[in-house]
């Protein structure tokens, strides 16, 4: 417990909040070739590589991911949610924040049903997360 004198000399410092998705908080001025502070909920990007990755220790699977170059020229790894996808190199995707806990280095999700990404076929529940239209029946 500090004394009043200690607090007068050096007051308490508030914690600095670090962003969970730093690539979404930058814009790029291509004319000046400089980064600017520009917070966005999502960003557009182009897939440079689509592949699979194995998760961390207790889990076992082949998780689908894409390497994406965002509109601010930052390259990130983004998870492709849902069963099956139509992404390939040069596909244009929409990326949102949100990490995948068992994949190291994956801090972003691809939004299904937006731009070149199709929704998940045959999905009945939780459709909005997977970009699936309401079935006709």
From Swiss-Prot:
GO cellular component: small ribosomal subunit
Family: Belongs to the universal ribosomal protein uS12 family.
InterPro entries xrefs: NA-bd_OB-fold (IPR012340), Ribosomal_uS12 (IPR006032), Ribosomal_uS12_bac (IPR005679)
Keywords recorded for this protein, A-Z: Methylation, Ribonucleoprotein, Ribosomal protein, RNA-binding, rRNA-binding, tRNA-binding
Biological function: With S4 and S5 plays an important role in translational accuracy. Interacts with and stabilizes bases of the 16S rRNA that are involved in tRNA selection in the A site and with the mRNA backbone. Located at the interface of the 30S and 50S subunits, it traverses the body of the 30S subunit contacting proteins on the other side and probably holding the rRNA structure together. The combined cluster of proteins S8, S12 and S17 appears to hold together the shoulder and platform of the 30S subunit.
Keyword Ion transport included in the entry's annotation: no
Chain positions with 3-methylthioaspartic acid modification: 102
Keyword Secreted appears in the UniProt entry: no
NCBIfam families documented for this protein: rpsL_bact
Region described as Disordered: spans on this chain: 1-57, 118-137
GO-annotated molecular function: rRNA binding; structural constituent of ribosome; tRNA binding
Protein name per the record: Small ribosomal subunit protein uS12
Pfam families xref list: Ribosom_S12_S23 (PF00164)
Subunit structure: Part of the 30S ribosomal subunit. Contacts proteins S8 and S17. May interact with IF1 in the 30S initiation complex.
CDD domains named in the record: Ribosomal_S12
One of the GO BP terms on file: translation
